[in-house]
Amino acid sequence: MATENKILILGATGAIGRHIVWASIKAGNPTYALVRKTSDNVNKPKLTEAANPETKEELLKNYQASGVILLEGDINDHETLVNAIKQVDTVICAAGRLLIEDQVKVIKAIKEAGNVKRFFPSEFGLDVDRHDAVEPVRQVFEEKASIRRVVESEGVPYTYLCCHAFTGYFLRNLAQIDATDPPRDKVVILGDGNVRGAYVTEADVGTYTIRAANDPNTLNKAVHIRLPNNYLTANEVIALWEKKIGKTLEKTYVSEEQVLKDIQTSSFPHNYLLALYHSQQIKGDAVYEIDPAKDVEAYDAYPDVKYTTADEYLNQFV
């Protein structure tokens, strides 16, 4: 169904931004993308490259062919940013972790433009107001939380999107460092493997984001994506994979104490990924009760969405 809600995506060619663009187009929203004159990042982590093989140039051509309105600009260029924002109703920022704090510039531009009905700051992970993460991830979460406070203090209408674990980072390799596919012989499990995590495909994040953007009931609330068939422990995920390949994997369980040591002695991106895995698989940062006054559970709000289950997602690797 077509909608008049004009949506601008910042970070539209990134790992999650591209899925938000396609979901917006599919939903019938007039869709805009702020695009910088830059080439692809040749230093993309292997997981990111495996999940998103399409180049930036290919992506932009496909956007144009699909009706996306490309606006040349940059978060750090106030004039082009304001001009872009003035053309839309909703701004969704999917900028990477290095640009989190730069969103104060987006907020400033939104305030100047004066027409934005909703802003989605770049989160797309766990709820940054509910976590027990360690460094180096903790700093990023704290930066995201500080952006929330600026949004609220400035009176900018918002929605926070908490999607937890992308399948492209957590499921396609069963959270194995330096692997891009699920293991077939041995698997390392952080903690006891009995803590539930919330998995979701990047495409489904796009779908739920746009549903929330078009839903007045999510105004000034956080939307949580914890889908019943994807709300699983590491042991449950591994059992799904073992059933598919007809083989029992050799399992090594790593204590929290050892994981914390490994985080401290590893370099980026290993330490960052380990800290993310620690947050979900050991600390259980996807397990919490929501407050209906300020939170929305995506599955309950949009039960008609046909999401990809963890079981279905793993079929491609058999």
UniProtKB/Swiss-Prot annotation:
One of its GO terms (molecular function) is 2'-hydroxyisoflavone reductase activity. Reduces achiral isoflavones to chiral isoflavanones during the biosynthesis of chiral pterocarpan phytoalexins. The reduction product (sophrol) is a third isomer, which represents the penultimate intermediate in the synthesis of the phytoalexin (+)-pisatin, the major phytoalexin in pea. It comes from Pisum sativum (Garden pea). Keywords: NADP, Oxidoreductase. Its EC number is 1.3.1.45. Pfam families: NmrA. This is Isoflavone reductase. NADP(+) binds at G11, A12, T13, G14, A15, I16, G17, R36, K44, R148. Belongs to the NmrA-type oxidoreductase family. Isoflavone reductase subfamily.
